[in-house]
Amino acid sequence: MNFESHAQAGQDLWVWEMAEHKTDGYYVDLGCNDARFHSNTYALEEHGWKGLLVDIVCGCENRKGTFILSDAAAPNERLRLYYKHIPAVVDYLTLDCDDATLGAFNALPWDRTTFRLITVETDVYRKGPADRDKMRTMLKAMGYHLVCGDVFVEWPEGTFVPYEDWFAFPDLVNPQLIKRFQSDGVFWKDILKQ
């Protein structure tokens, strides 16, 4: 099955592999921004996935998923209502809210939802490790496994910087795939070659 990535750092390709080419997945995309350009979920939608798209600015209204205009770090009433009705197990959570990522992370319904796979933009290269370390600590305490730490992107051209962390909930993911992609401080294209 042909899978064309739209993500900035291959997040959709990683999820596609880790979810074993699942075609009926559910995602939560916080910081969805543009409908297609650098979208972590658009290609998954093209393969049958559906979900919730949230951003503080318009841009994803024409997607198959449900778009909510809200600050994910300070959810409005509509977003809080949707959080009450998302599945107990969500296949993929993507967090890319720039400086509000930690706030969006903290606002999620962790008490009633388990996320099979998570990619979270940490921007360690520009913000330092404090927010990344807080999220890592909280996710580890909830039973998540850091599969790919400090995933590197090339930005600007010719410069490689730590950008994201990718997690899995081990009880919901093939352990051989966790082992296959296990890495730290690796350029995203090299992770996907494994």
Where are these regions (language model features)?
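A broad, low-specificity signal for short, low-complexity segments enriched in glycine/proline
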Residues: 11-14, 79-82, 124
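Conserved acidic-Pro-Pro-aromatic motif
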Residues: 26, 41-50, 56, 65, ...
